[in-house]
């Protein structure tokens, strides 16, 4: 009789544990970009904060997810406590993007405002080859496992003038321009099985749970969950439809042409720059 009672209790606790797994909700992330890893000019570094932080949120259920940036109108001045020298200072504001992922069809719809227009980038998700580790750590009160993969990312190097060039090697930055080249990059993520949905920030999915942290290129770009909640605005979890529709390859070709035009005429497109003085 005791054995039966113990077995029933174990079964009950197992059921409770499974039911406790989140199937829908919201994850708030902080993205921290190391700007100095892109900037080679020492003088320009004194005018730009080492780290650029921004906030994002991921709305999700078992069918879809929506990753979007949080408005930065009230963002604090990163130079407020830096103690930097005088002269003009640069603050970079990235365009506010929205990425919707249909988990059933593995299709992604990204609305991206750039160059005074909106692009709707529609394409299938590229499966990532994850290597899962048993190493764990806690993020936002959730135990996470480690996984790694490699991706081809855009390697950006900014020289002294800030002009744009599509170069082939980092030596081009000595000419005082910005060089964008493809680069094989390691990605380390931490995911939790406390959340059933296979979701994550940006294009990072495909693990048995939700990704709560992404480390791209050894700290160059880190996205970390700061809050996880079962409550979210369900009405906002919808596929974007507005914008000039194209796939990722077409978008990359369009960006290449626009960057070349920027090199000739100047401008930063959808990226905003604020300048000020100490």
What are these regions (language model features)?
Residues 1-27, 278:
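Bacterial Sec-dependent N-terminal signal peptides
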Residues 22-278:
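Extended soluble regions of mature proteins
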């Amino acid at each position: 009789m005791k054995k039966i009672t113990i077995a029933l209790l174990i079964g009950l606790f197992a059921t409770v544990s499974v039911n406790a797994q989140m199937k829908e909700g919201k994850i708030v992330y902080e993205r921290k970009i190391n700007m100095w890893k892109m900037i080679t000019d020492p003088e320009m570094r004194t005018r730009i904060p080492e780290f650029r932080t921004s906030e994002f949120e991921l709305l999700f259920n078992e069918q879809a997810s929506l990753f979007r940036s949080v408005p930065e109108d009230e963002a604090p001045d990163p130079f407020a406590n830096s103690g930097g020298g005088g002269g003009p200072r640069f603050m970079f504001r990235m365009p506010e993007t929205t990425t919707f992922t249909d988990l059933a069809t593995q299709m992604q719809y990204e609305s991206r405002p750039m160059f005074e227009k909106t692009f709707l980038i529609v394409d299938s998700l590229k499966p990532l080859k994850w290597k899962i580790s048993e190493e764990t750590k806690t993020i936002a009160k959730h135990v996470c496992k480690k996984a790694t993969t490699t991706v081809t990312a855009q390697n950006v190097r900014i020289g002294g003038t800030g002009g744009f060039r599509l170069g082939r090697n980092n030596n081009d930055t000595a000419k005082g321009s910005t060089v964008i080249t493809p680069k094989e990059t390691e990605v380390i993520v931490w995911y939790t099985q406390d959340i059933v949905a296979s979701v994550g920030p940006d294009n990072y999915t495909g693990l048995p749970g939700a990704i709560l942290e992404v480390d791209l290129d050894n700290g160059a770009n880190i996205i970390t969950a700061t809050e996880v909640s079962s409550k979210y605005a369900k009405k906002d979890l919808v596929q974007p439809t507005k914008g000039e529709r194209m796939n990722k390859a077409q978008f990359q070709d369009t960006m290449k042409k626009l960057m070349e035009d920027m090199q000739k005429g100047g401008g930063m497109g959808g990226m905003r720059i604020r300048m000020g003085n100490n």
